[in-house]
Amino acid sequence: MKSLWMLSASFFFSLMAVFVKMGAEDFGTFELIFYRSLAGVILLYTFIRSRGYTIRTPYLFGHFKRSFIGTVSMSIWFLSLTMLPVGTSMTLNYTSPLFLSSFMVVILLMRKQPMPWGLLSCIVLGFCGVVLVLQPSFSSGQMLGAMLALASGFLGSVAYWQIKELGQLKEPSWRIVFYFTVFGTFYGLLGNLFLEGGLSPITLDNIGYLIGMAVCATCAQCSLTLAFGQGNVLLSSCLQFSAIIMAELMGLFFFGDALSLTTEIGIAVIMVSGVCATMLTRRQQTKP
């Protein structure tokens, strides 16, 4: 099942976050977006030329929508991180699977098709696991940050839906990611020049962080695009929660972050929801 590529995406996104955290002391946010995207352009264009593929597409506007919405979603999430505790911001950002489920429910109701209550329940269960792991908290004066994080989750779901539409148009995953990285390159560079005062020096001490971040980001985006573009949207949404598990494990192994009992219970809940969603989807696909 193509949706299982989401597990690969979650792993690489979590590993990318490790490199971002290590390089954050030397580079600004827009600068990291620029280097991450630029390396993706170089890697993917090299792959495209070596295989004799083409970047020409009749769906250029669709690629622009996916890239623009996805980049805006990422940007306002970064902004929400400056206004909210990390756990709260991430929890609200991970409402995107809930929004995707809502889109699917509306479409199925309009088409008068049967509702996949089992998968929808797994997504809700997985989100409950995310809440247990991240343990969000609010205080007065954080409404703007909460709205931004929630908007990021909504826009993220719209971007994922756009990936699904491009996949249905037979656009290959590498082309979808290529245009996303091209957009991110210009966006990151302009943001850096106007808001961060220019690029920081690259040294032997920090270049490894950039390379690791760029390779992981490219692999993660390709995997995510395969999952949403060619897989089951609801299953991919549910498996997206696995990124929370992998991020916690990365924090444990690389930074010595301790796991509380509540976190461990939340991880177990996310794992159960993912396994159940996979089994339900496989059973549905094997029905005559």
Regions found by a protein language model. Give the residues of each.
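Loop-to-transmembrane-helix transition segments
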Residues: 1-9, 49-78, 144-152, 192, ...
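C-terminal transmembrane-helix exit sites in multi-pass transporters
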Residues: 97-119, 245-264
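Hydrophobic transmembrane alpha-helices of multi-pass small-molecule transport proteins
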Residues: 115-135, 262-281
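Hydrophobic/aromatic residues within transmembrane alpha-helices
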Residues: 23, 32, 36, 80, ...
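C-terminal-most transmembrane helix of multi-pass membrane proteins
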Residues: 239-288
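Transmembrane alpha-helical segments that form core, pore/gating elements
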Residues: 18, 44, 137-196
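Membrane-interface helix-cap regions at the ends of transmembrane helices
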Residues: 41-59, 128-140, 184-206, 277
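Helix-helix packing/entry segments at the starts of transmembrane helices
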Residues: 89-95, 170-183, 218-253
